[in-house]
Amino acid sequence: MEPLKVSGSGGIPMKTRLNIILEKSINKILIILGLLLIASTVITITLTVEYIRVENELQLCKMGAEVAKTTLEPPAQPTKTTPTLTSTRSTTATFKTRPVSRTNHHTNPSCWREEEKCQNITAKWSNCFGTFLPVRVNCTVLRELCDEQLGNHTTVQVSKRCTCIYALNWDCSYA
């Protein structure tokens, strides 16, 4: 490419030269601008969806902590003195969604659902920042938690963003 000559000396004027360059590359410029617009739109939508998801999880954690605070009760004293077989169940959630069975005994699957046979039920609710708040709950609350779910299991979900771990530990004695 030869250097531009000064106007009046027989060369192409600068304005005309720029117009020629723009005409040759206008399609490329429009494609690049379109791609930048699409990329910024995708990033904005992704960030908005992620923000809404995290906000929803924080609300669930706050609601769980409020439910736990309202269901405080003193430790239950066993009323029977007959020897019983005790099965201890401890359920925690990992970073994946997994089902947690509502039954823990093959011959008497609904034992823990009977009010007088549930003992030492403890629910641990996280406050989304890694510390747990152990509280006492009664069998009615435990039944309601499981009955809110569809099917025969309770689903526990944990997010990498908000470690909202909900764990149930309970003992169920069998006569």
Curated annotation (Swiss-Prot):
One of its GO terms (cellular component) is membrane. Its main location: virion. It is found in: Virion membrane; Host cell membrane. Residues 1-28 are intravirion. It comes from the Viruses. Keywords: Glycoprotein, Host cell membrane, Host membrane, Hydrogen ion transport, Ion transport, Membrane, Phosphoprotein, Signal-anchor, Transmembrane, Transmembrane helix, Transport, Virion. GO terms for biological process: proton transmembrane transport. It is a single-pass type II membrane protein. The chain crosses the membrane at residues 29-49. Glycans are attached at residues 120, 138, 152. Residues 50-175 are virion surface. Viroporin that forms a ion channel probably displaying low ion selectivity. Plays a role in counteracting host innate immunity by inhibiting TLR7/MyD88/TRAF6 signaling and STAT1 phosphorylation, leading to down-regulation of type-I IFN. Belongs to the metapneumovirus small hydrophobic protein family. Homooligomer. Interacts with glycoprotein G. This is Small hydrophobic protein. It comes from Avian metapneumovirus (isolate Canada goose/Minnesota/15a/2001) (AMPV). The lineage of its organism: Viruses, Riboviria, Orthornavirae, Negarnaviricota, Haploviricotina.
